Amino acid sequence: MAELACFCYPHLENDSYKFIPFNNLAIKCMLTAKVDKKDQDKFYNSIIYGIAPPPQFKKRYNTNDNSRGMNYETSMFNKVAALICEALNSTKVTQSDIASVLSRVVSVRHLENLVLRRENHQDVLFHSKELLLKSVLIAIGHSKEIETTATAEGGEIVFQNTAFTMWRLTYLEHKLMPILDPNFIEYKITVNEGKPISESHIKELIAELRWQYNKFAVITHGKGHYRVVKYSSVANHADRVYATYKSNNKNGNMLEFNLLDQRIIWQNWYAFTSSMKQGNTLDTCKKLLFQKIKRESNPFKGLSTDRKMDEVSQIGI
C-alpha cells in the first residue's frame, strides 16, 4: 500500500491540476536528503532531477534500511506512476480536492496488475483506453464504482460462472512490490456485472468454495469484491483493512465499506468488519476473528455435503 503522493505531484493549470509522475533519480535524491521536520509533508525539490515525494513517505520505498517498500528504480514503477497520472488527468481535480486525492492509500500490486493487463494483447484493457482508465480510477478510489470482472486487477482465472469470476493472484511474479513468501496463495472473486445475482449462481460459487477451497476464508476489503485467503493470514488482512479504513476516514476519503453477501463471507470476518464500521478499536474487532460464531441457519439447505474424500480439495494444505 502507498499514498498517491508517492507516485506523482500536481501542477496547477488554470482552475484544475495536471499530475506529473516522479522520476527515479528525484526519489533517490529525496531519500538521501536531510529535511526539517516542518517540511516533511511538503513535496521535495531535488534541484537537479525535479520534484520528489514528501519525505514523510520515505518508508514507502525500498532502501538498504527498508526492504518492505516499493522497488522504485524499476521500469514498473515508471509505468504505474504514468498510468496513475493518465487516469487522474482524464478527470478534473480542483484545489479543494487535491489534498484528499494525494493522501489516498492505494494497492501497489493492484496497479501493477493493471499495467500487466494493459500490455497483454489478448486482454480487453489493451484494446479499450476508456475501460483501462475506468479500471485505474476504481483502483485508486477516484470512482465510486466497484471493481467488476472487466475492470479487475486480473490474474489467473480459476473459476467462472454467469455471475462471478475467481482469480488466482500472481503477486509472486511482481517487480514493484513482490510477495517474497514462496508459499503465498490468494484469490479474488469479482462480480461479472453490477446487477442483482440469482440464488442459483450464488449457490454455484459457495459449492465451489466449500469443496475446492475449504482451507481458505472468504473475506472482503470493502471494495465490492471477495478475497479468498489462508486462515493463517486473516489477522494480517485485518490489520491492513482496519488501518486503511481509519486512514481514509481521517483524510476525508471515505467510501462506503461494502460488507457484501453474508452468506458467502466467513462469519467471523463479517463480524470483524461490522464492528469496525461501528467505530470500535482494532483489538475489540480482532477478538471477533477468534471467537466461535455459529451461523443462524444454513442459507442453502439444498447444497449437498455428501462428498467423497477424493473430491475434497487439497489446495492450501
From Swiss-Prot:
Principal cellular location given in the protein's record:
host cell
Quote the EC number: 3.6.4.-
Q: Which domain of life is it from?
A: Viruses
Q: Which GO terms describe its cellular component?
A: host cell cytoplasm
Q: Which GO terms describe its biological process?
A: viral genome replication
Catalytic residues (UniProt)? 225 (for ntpase and rtpase activities)
Q: Which InterPro entries match?
A: Rota_NS35_C, Rota_NS35_N, Rotavirus_NSP2, Rotavirus_NSP2_C, Rotavirus_NSP2_N
In this chain, ATP is annotated as bound at: 107-109, 188, 221-223, 227
Report if keyword Flavoprotein is assigned. no
Name the record gives this protein: Non-structural protein 2
Origin species: Rotavirus A (strain RVA/Human/United States/DS-1/1976/G2P1B[4]) (RV-A)
